[in-house]
Amino acid sequence: MAGTTSIEKSEILSRLLDKEGIKHNVLNAKNHEKEAEIIAQAGKFGAVTVATNMAGRGTDIMLGGNAEFLAKNDLKKAGFTPDLIAEATGFAETDNETILKARKMFSDAEDKYRKELAPEADKVREAGGLFILGTERHESRRIDNQLRGRSGRQGDPGESRFYLCMEDDIMRLFGTERMQKMMETLKIDDDTPIDAKILSGAIENAQKKVESKNFQARKNTLEYDDM
């Protein structure tokens, strides 16, 4: 999964992938009606997903595919209403025959899909799990951490790596001269990862500056509204 900081950048990356003939899905606010389906497929072997960092948050990406989503989709295709599907996936006690029938159908379908998806889930785990590629650092550390947290869920393997450029918004606005000089001194090619604490610390300081600036702007707005 490749995380971007805006819809515009997710679409630019999507066009570049199209140009290279790489099949992928795009998850952003423009595609919200397909969000559940894209998230459900994002953990399949070989799946490539481009997402804005906030899109689909709160939904775990299941390695191999999401059996629960596929089972719910079966109920939808069978003509069950959204309210009945919600009841079918719930646990409240009931003697309503329609709900009980829907629950039985959902349970059977979920078990079937879990068995079907298990070999693919193992294949994804053996390959290292979900790989998160951050195309740049967000101005908020919290959002960066949410993107990182999409991989390695529930004991599954996973990895995340952010790729930075001195022309990224946060680096351009708050990247220090010291950082620029350090990059020039190291003379490392673009394919070599840099895991230096001094670089991580400089980026974190830049994010703190942005967060502080945004907080002050919100505070000033509230004070103005209270006048």
What residues fall within each predicted segment?
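Conserved strand-helix element at the start of the C-terminal RecA-like helicase core
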Residues: M1-L13
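Short acidic, glycine/proline-enriched loop segments that cap or flank alpha-helices
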Residues: M1-T4, I194, K219-E223
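A glycine-rich phosphate-binding loop feature that marks nucleotide/adenosyl-phosphate handling sites
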Residues: T5-I7, L199-I203, E223-M227
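Conserved phosphate-handling catalytic cores of large alpha/beta enzymes
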Residues: D18-N214
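C-terminal accessory/connector segments of nucleic-acid motor ATPases
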Residues: K208-M227
